[in-house]
A protein has these predicted regions:
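Feature recognizes metal-dependent phosphohydrolase scaffolds
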Residues: 1-272
Length: 272
């Protein structure tokens, strides 16, 4: 059995609940398809949970792919790390990530910092620029979690089996079987809109809400979306009041199931 989850977005309780339904015995394994941070209130704890899980079972049984939110977080860290190492502020600063986080009540950054460190940032935020806040925050996070940051940096962008490609957003399907040779990070991490139709391998991805007009076109739809051909999309809107989905692939039967509350429901093409 191959399990898959995506777009956990800081929701540790939902992750732990889903993992109670996962059996990693025998040849079973699980693939996490990115976006573990932001929006929810437990981003660090989600990352730590996955890191510990992978250390326990190994990288072959627990595959942790990178999502666009992890990459934005890393871009922000790297930009301000360069400011310190170069001794100059003449560089392009990546403020999109931290501005978005502050819009959500600093839900992510606060989980990486102690209360004392967060109080300090809130204090200087009254008079200092976002650049100053970022410089201080990055130094604190690197000091606290250098090994964890390295682990996030090493996350692969896709996982491939003989018949499947697990990825956060998608691949360049126009390239056919040569998709990996010209695959850009932007496509793998941020492809939009979601692709439907026939491909030579099955694509399992997250990144999007399956309720979107490009997929189910139904605001109430928060299940795995199967286009009836080559694409399974795991809904990415748990933080909006949806549910964290668990997909399971039976390698012997070649069938996909949505696992919920201990029950496995066969994934039919959307609309059937």
């Amino acid at each position: 059995m191959i399990y898959a989850m995506s777009d956990i977005h800081g929701c540790i309780g939902e992750l732990q609940k889903n993992m109670e339904q996962v059996d990693l015995g025998g040849d079973n394994r699980i693939v996490f398809c990115g976006d573990y941070i932001d929006y929810g209130d437990s981003s660090y704890y989600v990352l730590k949970y996955l890191w510990d899980l992978q250390k326990k079972y190994g990288t072959e049984k627990v595959v942790v792919l990178k999502g666009n939110h992890e990459q934005m977080f890393l871009d922000w860290i790297e930009d301000y790390r360069n400011i310190y190492s170069d001794g100059t502020e003449d560089c392009m600063t990546f403020n999109d990530w931290i501005c978005t986080d502050f819009d959500y009540g600093a839900n992510t950054i606060s989980t990486f910092l102690s209360k004392q460190q967060m109080d300090f940032l809130n204090q200087i935020a009254r008079t200092c620029s976002m650049e100053t806040i970022s410089r201080e925050a990055v130094q604190m996070i690197i000091s606290n979690y250098e090994k964890l940051i390295w682990w996030i940096q090493q996350m692969p962008l896709y996982f491939e089996t003989k018949s499947q490609i697990f990825v956060h957003a998608g691949v360049d399907e126009e390239a056919g079987e040569y998709w990996m040779w010209g695959a850009s990070d932007n496509t793998l991490l941020g492809k939009f809109p979601a692709t439907k139709g026939k491909f030579y391998k099955t694509i399992i991805a997250g990144h999007v809400g399956t309720c979107s007009r490009d997929l189910a076109a139904d605001r109430s739809y928060h299940d795995v979306y199967y286009d009836g051909e080559s694409h399974y999309y795991i809904d990415g809107s748990v933080y909006k009041g949806g549910k964290l989905l668990l997909l399971a692939y039976d390698e012997e039967k070649g069938e996909y199931y949505q696992v919920e509350n201990g029950r496995m429901a066969f994934v039919n093409p959307a609309g059937i």
